[in-house]
Amino acid sequence: PSVVIGFFCLVTVASFLQDVTGIPYRLNAIVGGIGLSLAVIPIVFSIAEDALSAVPRSLHEASLALGSTEWQTAYRVMLPAAAPGVFAAVLLGIGRAFGETMIAIMATGNAPLSTWSPIEPARTVAATIGSEMGEVVWGSEHYGVLFFLGVLLFVVSFSLNAITELYVKKRLIKRFQG
């Protein structure tokens, strides 16, 4: 799916955005962001939907029985009850986006530039590793830098997952004990 989304962004989204906005670079950080969102939204939606459907039906019915509207019930009862799961879904989506390689390589222009402009080509950490690891000399300084980037990517992804787990466990324990 990552290659398909990257190719879709490369062919369709990039051309459309350049035609509509007149952005000088066809492949840029905006196109990469759209591609990453296409990859991440289904994951976040699926996990958040599971979290919302895990909320007991009795909470929903009790809120409606007390005179709340459907919107009030959703906002004040269902969403707070499912908040740990929704939070976990968002952080897992961020972790997936952070580690995505193919979409970033195909849709952002994969230019080794350091810029904050979203309309210029860019390169992510994962794309740098994916692009350069095949040509690097083993044991060289370049290899060490790529290895460090891999460790950095692992640490950030692991930290996001650990924070998610700790937060969700804390919220669930608090909810079911008190």
For every predicted segment, state its role:
Residues A104-F154:
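Interhelical loop and adjacent transmembrane-helix boundary motif
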Residues P1-C9, S46-I47, K174-G178:
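Cytoplasmic-entry segments and transmembrane alpha-helices of multi-pass inner-membrane transporters
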Residues E49-S53, R57-H60, L64, G134-G178:
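C-terminal transmembrane helix and the adjacent membrane-cytosol boundary/short C-terminal tail
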Residues V4-T12, V86-M106, V155-I163:
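Hydrophobic alpha-helical segments of membrane proteins
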Residues V13, G33-V44, I94-F98, T108-A111, ...:
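Hydrophobic transmembrane alpha-helices
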